[in-house]
UniProtKB/Swiss-Prot annotation:
Coiled coil: none annotated. The keyword Isomerase applies. Belongs to the thioester dehydratase family. FabA subfamily. GO terms for cellular component: cytoplasm. GO terms for molecular function: (3R)-hydroxyacyl-[acyl-carrier-protein] dehydratase activity; trans-2-decenoyl-acyl-carrier-protein isomerase activity. One of its GO terms (biological process) is unsaturated fatty acid biosynthetic process. Homodimer. Necessary for the introduction of cis unsaturation into fatty acids. Catalyzes the dehydration of (3R)-3-hydroxydecanoyl-ACP to E-(2)-decenoyl-ACP and then its isomerization to Z-(3)-decenoyl-ACP. Can catalyze the dehydratase reaction for beta-hydroxyacyl-ACPs with saturated chain lengths up to 16:0, being most active on intermediate chain length. This is 3-hydroxydecanoyl-[acyl-carrier-protein] dehydratase. PANTHER family: 3-HYDROXYACYL-[ACYL-CARRIER-PROTEIN] DEHYDRATASE, 3-HYDROXYDECANOYL-[ACYL-CARRIER-PROTEIN] DEHYDRATASE. It is found in: Cytoplasm.
Length: 174
């Protein structure tokens, strides 16, 4: 493990360092690099708090019409793919596991229920992700289970229940 010192917030530069494997150490939890990094900042992360008192994360992504996905999804009808918002929530659960000092490479393991009740258009200004940890297993298996919400300019539009992310020492047979 590196000499990682947990903070309560992280800048985009910090998140990119995480994507390079420099935050939690080589071979441990890391975020994807742009373009798949769906966060600009983590404004709050805590071991306590959230709806279940087991931890929470609040993060943001600034929206601009020149983001890569608007050009291809869909021509003449640009909208952010919902799967990117879902992936951002998985990214945050994995980040939380590494932030807590757990070792291993992160992998999304699924989610229970997922609902989309709105969309993210190029005219939007900001997405906010709010993750509520329900359970963190820290034994031979390292896994986080959380509920998440995505809001666009203050309106809740995506809801995910039982997001699951695990950390694995070896992903060869995954």
């Amino acid at each position: 493990m590196t000499s990682f010192q947990p903070q309560s917030s992280y800048s985009r530069d910090d998140l990119i360092e995480c994507g390079k494997g420099n935050l939690f150490g080589p071979g441990n939890a890391q975020l994807p690099l742009p373009n798949m990094l769906m966060l600009d900042r983590i404004t709050h992360i805590s071991h306590t708090g959230g709806e279940f008192g087991k931890g929470e994360i609040i993060a943001e992504l600034d929206i601009s019409p020149d983001l890569w996905f608007f050009e291809c999804h869909f021509p003449g009808d640009p909208v952010m793919p919902g799967c990117l918002g879902l992936d951002a929530m998985w990214q945050l659960v994995g980040f939380f596991l590494g932030w807590k000092g757990n070792l291993g490479r992160g992998r999304a393991l699924g989610c229970g229920e997922l609902k989309f009740t709105g969309q993210i258009l190029p005219t939007a200004k900001k997405i906010t992700y709010h993750i509520h940890l329900k359970r963190v297993i820290e034994r031979k298996l390292i896994m986080g289970i959380a509920d998440g919400r995505v809001s666009c300019d203050g309106k809740d539009i995506y809801f995910a229940h039982d997001l699951r992310v695990g950390l694995f020492q070896n992903t060869d047979s995954f």
